[in-house]
Amino acid sequence: MMKIIAAFLFLLVTTFVSRCLSADIESDKQALLEFASLVPHSRKLNWNSTIPICASWTGITCSKNNARVTALRLPGSGLYGPLPEKTFEKLDALRIISLRSNHLQGNIPSVILSLPFIRSLYFHENNFSGTIPPVLSHRLVNLDLSANSLSGNIPTSLQNLTQLTDLSLQNNSLSGPIPNLPPRLKYLNLSFNNLNGSVPSSVKSFPASSFQGNSLLCGAPLTPCPENTTAPSPSPTTPTEGPGTTNIGRGTAKKVLSTGAIVGIAVGGSVLLFIILAIITLCCAKKRDGGQDSTAVPKAKPGRSDNKAEEFGSGVQEAEKNKLVFFEGSSYNFDLEDLLRASAEVLGKGSYGTTYKAILEEGTTVVVKRLKEVAAGKREFEQQMEAVGRISPHVNVAPLRAYYFSKDEKLLVYDYYQGGNFSMLLHGNNEGGRAALDWETRLRICLEAARGISHIHSASGAKLLHGNIKSPNVLLTQELHVCVSDFGIAPLMSHHTLIPSRSLGYRAPEAIETRKHTQKSDVYSFGVLLLEMLTGKAAGKTTGHEEVVDLPKWVQSVVREEWTGEVFDVELIKQQHNVEEEMVQMLQIAMACVSKHPDSRPSMEEVVNMMEEIRPSGSGPGSGNRASSPEMIRSSDSPV
């Protein structure tokens, strides 16, 4: 009898649970259909009640038993308007919500941040306004609300989120002090807000870039806070015996203040007059010195139409003007005198010097790189230049055409490439926004760059290295074919050269620590270049109000916890179809390249082979080997 009752109860419970599960997934479906009807979207969603939600709906992930919807991912889907709060109350099993890079506006519904199982919220690059809801789920791991219009204080409840590892609130209008934040936090960015007060001790270990753009913040790692000084209480200088005495005291105080002001003005005027006289004296002395030393600077001639050209010839001495050394195979027919007469335009300033576009009188256009802080002597410099200049030709390597060396001036001459460089193509420049670069073009550019670097590594008995791999040094022809430039310069430079933060973003940890470059550190830099291509984020500090980005660390923090696809450039997601596997494969190659341990990184030859396997010659999207699971990426030893 007991067995029959137990069997009956088991059947009853099983039926009840199955019905509950069915109701749950059905209610999730209805909630999502409600979401689609309430939130306008320019990209069509294939959400239809007639097709299975877990298998076919765009941006939807379900639990393993298909019982509940656990992830909603609609980045760059053209969503606009406010989010419906009641809809998310019904989706209480969500662990991940990614609505980044849309046009959503209004307040962030408080129910979303307090969902019981929510772990990752990616709401950056929208138009959300209002304050950050104070009630937050204790399970939150990743919270990105950056690049919105949020205001008010940062909630103090954040300090109670013991699992939070990544917090991005930059580029908003948040104000007030920074609260204490949880100790497990590994990535923090609060830059470009209106925060004030002292940086709390719980986050002082983060770099200054995490707090930049908040002019009222102080304390480590920013400038020290001023000491708190309290003004002494005013006390009367004479006893107050009645109204008459008080009036005399006030009158005396005014008289003393007026005298002090007069003395201050007199002293200030004297100091100002002294400074003006000193400046006039220095200017006169410089003018006299310039007249005596005018022979050291090449005299401008009528054909020289731009004063910028003098910058890369200012250290050239008259006796050495014809010592421009050309390499075999160069078709140029000019000497240093012709080069110094050329009009010039600054193309950019990098780690090792300034680059100019020089147009000679006969119309020839070349690129001249003026090196700074060269530590090598003449013999060592010439030997290195000979090794660089005599490397066997390769279609993806920009050849060094000529060089010049003197005590005060070191110049390198290259071909001019009309297509610009990969950085300009990927991120745009000051004159305009970036183009929507498709996956095919990105993949081909990076593969050609890899072939060029691999050739540099294999030439001259594998003794050469690049030493300065970054997207601005990946030059492009008009047909967008790649030539890798600026290789072989690193061994000549001073170890004390100040490397800009935008270049540090490409440097391997061991290269930053020792200031010595190897072929393995080149592989790391190329891995960062691949991550830059995949994410659309510039490595290191960029112009404008962009934050300092440690790409390997950022990518690893995302794929460690959640969905690998969250790292990809929204432009790729908008444009491309059937290339997700190739993108994941490329991400795996990039993460192998940026391994913390140099010996764990592949060689550039191996990198080329792996990239060629993704897209064999003549095959289309999706035809490469099937991508491995995201867990493989998360388990790599790349920096966290």
Curated annotation (Swiss-Prot):
InterPro entries: At_inactive_RLKs (IPR050994), Kinase-like_dom_sf (IPR011009), Leu-rich_rpt (IPR001611), LRR_dom_sf (IPR032675), LRR_N_plant-typ (IPR013210), Prot_kinase_dom (IPR000719), Protein_kinase_ATP_BS (IPR017441), Ser-Thr/Tyr_kinase_cat_dom (IPR001245)
Gene3D superfamilies: Phosphorylase Kinase, domain 1 (3.30.200.20), Ribonuclease Inhibitor (3.80.10.10), Transferase(Phosphotransferase) domain 1 (1.10.510.10)
Signal peptide: 1-22
GO MF annotations in UniProt: ATP binding; protein kinase activity
Residues covered by the Protein kinase domain: 341-614
Binding sites annotated in the UniProt record for ATP: 347-355, 369
PROSITE patterns: PROTEIN_KINASE_ATP, PROTEIN_KINASE_DOM
Location(s), subcellular: Membrane
Positions carrying Phosphothreonine: 364, 441, 514, 564
LRR repeats: from-to residues: 93-115, 117-138, 139-162, 163-185, 186-206
Bilayer disposition of the protein: Single-pass membrane protein
Domain of life: Eukaryota
Keyword terms, alphabetized: ATP-binding, Leucine-rich repeat, Membrane, Nucleotide-binding, Phosphoprotein, Repeat, Signal, Transmembrane, Transmembrane helix
Entry keyword annotation includes Repeat: yes
Regions of compositional bias (Low complexity) in chain numbering: 226-247
Pfam entry (one): PK_Tyr_Ser-Thr
Start and end residues of each stretch annotated as Disordered: 222-249, 289-315, 612-640
Residue positions, PTM Phosphoserine: 343
Membrane-spanning ranges: 260-280
GO cellular component: cytosol; plant-type cell wall; plasma membrane; plasmodesma
Family under the similarity heading: Belongs to the protein kinase superfamily. Tyr protein kinase family.
Domain characteristics, as noted in the entry: The protein kinase domain is predicted to be catalytically inactive.
Protein name: Probable inactive receptor kinase At3g08680
Organism in which the protein naturally occurs: Arabidopsis thaliana (Mouse-ear cress)
